[in-house]
């Protein structure tokens, strides 16, 4: 297979690509119930609709009192009833009267404090003795003390996390405006590819010279695991045929916001992605990035603002493009400004060096924890075809073009798994 010179890749700086990415339009918005918003991106501020709490409420189990009645203790009060959380009291306290309240219950009218029950003696004749004085608003959550109507609870662009939902509901926010999920369609190209269907077929396919499709599946699994505000709406395998590839890509464009292709990005006579992209007449097309692995990566923006991303067929090259390019495209189109944190640590390089004068690089590394320090213990062979090395690592190091990390220096590591703890004897 001869390479075609017109297909040779001209490398572009990542900064150029990021400018294109950050100019992409965001997807439409929709209103959904708050309890369905986990992992979604707010398209508008989540605004508190009422004062919270709307009435004074008890912060402890105990006895609601008028603080003026227990200035001097012990004080004998008449017990007129009780209030539990989930109801609105229809009683009011008169002089020297009290009511039992549970945590979170609204206070009877005229009550301005709660005496915790351990400081109260029940006499059994409808009276109690209070043995601790309280000041106004002691052990009480006053009306509006959590939030006022019109307060912003979460800002637009925030990814809603599981723990945000109960807090939003407590503030009375029953629905929120979010970006719809970014839709993604994946096209795996290659006449050598076969779909994994039966476990016993995998080894037989390899022996017969076929390649079990795994790169597109990795993309789908990565999105499902790490990008909750996106969804893969389809995935297909097509042979090395330009018409078949173009039909699959056009189908993806009609059903998704982003089409991701794998394979066919090289300059050989059976690599057709370049021809397909030219036929689409993109408004913007960058092919070839100054990064390794993943130099043949391409990104195109069409006239209808749909995006097509071309990735290598090698999982390792695609993993780099996923974490550096694809994730940023999806974040931009989803309108993400505040997303979930990534598991990153600063680790010490104890031997060798990392980095490249001409290319941005991603390295697969093994990180261990020794005491309070993270150490890059092992760097396996870095070839993009060595997919099995993904089982030997637990982190990725990204170095920008021209950035060199020398022995003894620290570098940021994106963790893929928990680091091995050398100080924990249970791991030995």
What is each model feature region?
Residues 3, 57, 129, 148, ...:
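C-terminal terminal segments
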Residues 56-58, 69-72, 90-94, 107, ...:
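Solvent-exposed alpha-helices and their adjacent loops that cap or buttress functional pockets
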């Amino acid at each position: 297979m001869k390479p075609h010179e017109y297909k040779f890749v001209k490398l572009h700086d990542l900064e150029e690509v990021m400018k294109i990415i950050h100019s992409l339009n965001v997807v439409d918005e929709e209103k959904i119930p708050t309890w369905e918003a986990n992992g979604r991106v707010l398209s508008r501020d989540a605004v508190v609709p009422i004062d919270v709490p709307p009435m004074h409420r008890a912060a402890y189990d105990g006895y609601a009192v008028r603080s003026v009645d227990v200035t001097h203790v012990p004080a004998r009060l008449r017990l007129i009833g009780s209030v539990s959380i989930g109801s609105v009291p229809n009683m009011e306290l008169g002089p020297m009267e009290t009511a039992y309240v549970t945590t979170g219950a609204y206070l009877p009218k005229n009550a301005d404090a709660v005496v915790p029950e351990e400081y109260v003696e029940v006499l059994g004749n409808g009276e109690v003795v209070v043995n601790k004085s309280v000041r106004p608003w002691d052990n009480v959550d006053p009306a509006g003390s959590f939030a006022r109507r019109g307060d912003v609870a979460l800002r637009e662009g925030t990814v809603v996390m599981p723990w945000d939902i109960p807090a939003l509901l407590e503030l009375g926010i029953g629905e929120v405006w979010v970006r719809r999920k970014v839709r993604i369609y994946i096209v795996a190209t290659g006449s050598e590819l076969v779909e994994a269907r039966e476990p016993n077929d995998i080894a037989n396919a390899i022996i017969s010279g076929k390649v079990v499709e795994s790169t597109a599946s990795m993309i789908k699994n990565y999105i499902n695991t790490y990008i909750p505000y996106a969804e893969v709406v389809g995935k297909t395998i097509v042979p090395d045929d330009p018409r078949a590839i173009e039909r699959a890509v056009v189908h993806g464009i009609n059903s998704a916001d982003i089409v991701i292709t794998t394979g066919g990005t090289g300059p050989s006579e059976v690599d057709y992605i370049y021809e397909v992209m030219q036929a689409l007449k993109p408004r913007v097309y960058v092919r070839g990035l100054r990064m390794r692995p993943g130099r043949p990566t391409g990104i195109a923006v069409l006239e209808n603002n749909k995006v097509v991303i071309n990735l290598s067929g090698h999982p390792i090259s695609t993993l780099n493009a996923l974490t550096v390019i694809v994730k940023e495209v999806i974040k931009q189109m989803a309108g993400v400004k505040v997303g979930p944190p990534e598991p990153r640590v600063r680790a010490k390089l104890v031997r060798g060096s990392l980095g490249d004068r001409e290319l941005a690089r991603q390295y697969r590394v093994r990180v261990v924890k020794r005491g309070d320090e993270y150490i890059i213990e092992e760097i396996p062979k870095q070839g993009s075809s060595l997919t099995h090395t993904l089982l030997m690592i637990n982190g990725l190091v990204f170095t920008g073009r021209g950035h060199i990390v020398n022995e003894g220096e620290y570098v940021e590591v994106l963790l893929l798994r928990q680091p091995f703890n050398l100080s924990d004897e249970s791991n030995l």
